[in-house]
Amino acid sequence: MEGRPPVWIGHVVLGVDDVDSSAEFWRGIGMREVERNPHVAVLELRGGTHLVLVPGDPPADADAPFDVMVEDLDETHSAWKALGLDPSPIERGRIHASFTVRDPNGYRVTVNSSHVVGDV
């Protein structure tokens, strides 16, 4: 298969305690807000996938149902630390390096290094 695959993830829905504070967190780490009302926030990731934040009861101490990838993991780790977040130490794996950070709802989000170079 040449070029991009013909399918991709369109939306991921996350139940949150507070849509406003959650949207602020995700915007702060680099997502673009594309829709907002009192009951939902839609944020766009690179590649066009949308994270949809809706009121809900997030499970205590849960992993987010997705992970994110960034171009420069070390730079991202430092930048998020400077924002006052508390990223875990970076772990260097065989395929990815990664760290975790908690969002305002307690979801543990894994942040991976990218293994793709160039536009995706």
What do the PLM-derived regions correspond to, one by one?
Residues 32-64, 108-114:
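Conserved short beta-strand elements that form part of the metal-binding/catalytic scaffold
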Residues 6-7, 13-50:
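Core segments of cupin and vicinal oxygen chelate
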Residues 51, 74-76, 119:
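Residue-level signal for secondary-structure boundary sites
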Residues 1, 28-29, 53-55, 86-87:
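A generic local structural motif
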Residues 1-5, 8-17, 41, 57-120:
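Vicinal oxygen chelate
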